[in-house]
Amino acid sequence: MHASTGKGSKIKYSRVLFKISGEALMGSRPFGHDMELIDQLCKDISDIYKLGVQVCIVVGGGNIFRGASASLSGCERASSDYIGMLATIINALILQNFLEKNSVNSKVLSAIPMVTICEPYIRRKAIHHLEKGRVVIFAAGTGNPFFTTDTAAALRAVETNCDAILKGTQVNGVYSADPKKNEDAVMYDRLSYMDLLTRDLKVVDASAISLARENSIPIIVFSLKEEKIVNIVKGHGTYTIVSDCE
């Protein structure tokens, strides 16, 4: 495992995309938002922001609505996905409010234009905001149905030239099996993109893995509860890194 080596370490990743699932915003709740957890999460983002790291965020909407699940219940898949995209905009605006509360200048850019509440997604505008020291929150996924927010995260990371994708989850890395169900599950320190695909380790979807692989962007999977983001950007802490290792 990767071990932390102290506060004085240099920054390893200067521009990162932080992928936050909607479920992560629920905390221990069955749905909705755990505002204390969100506040702490934004304080953690503030820590790396103050170090000069340029931060993008893609947030999911599963704490409010899951398009794939709704389609199984009879709702048309495309319509379900659009509703899910609207849920991500709600989450993005909540994150923006808590970031601003923690003195972090932030902008929400939506793939579905909603100009009265946020900016439309324009790649050059997003990069401009990052260069000006603003956290950029990408909402509404890719703006297209049938694509997950994991794929949106990989796409935005490629478009904005990020050094890494940080995927915060409920466990501290990628395991050989579900550690909650199998006590013999082994956590991987490092995997290749192909390992994720061939071993069917359902941490990130195949489209997102392909985009990251084609553009050599590492994916770092870590626990939102147990690990500080500031450790991750310094290359320390406990996590699994998915990269071009073979």
Curated annotation (Swiss-Prot):
Chief subcellular location equals cytoplasm
Disulfide-bonded cysteine pairs: these are none
Enzyme Commission number(s) = 2.7.4.22
Enzyme class comes to transferase
Q: Where in the cell is it found?
A: Cytoplasm
Note the InterPro entries from the entry: AceGlu_kinase-like_sf, Asp/Glu/Uridylate_kinase, Uridylate_kinase, Uridylate_kinase_bac
Q: Which NCBIfam families does the UniProt record give?
A: pyrH_bact
Its name, as the record gives it, is Uridylate kinase
Q: Which organism is it from?
A: Wolbachia sp. subsp. Brugia malayi (strain TRS)
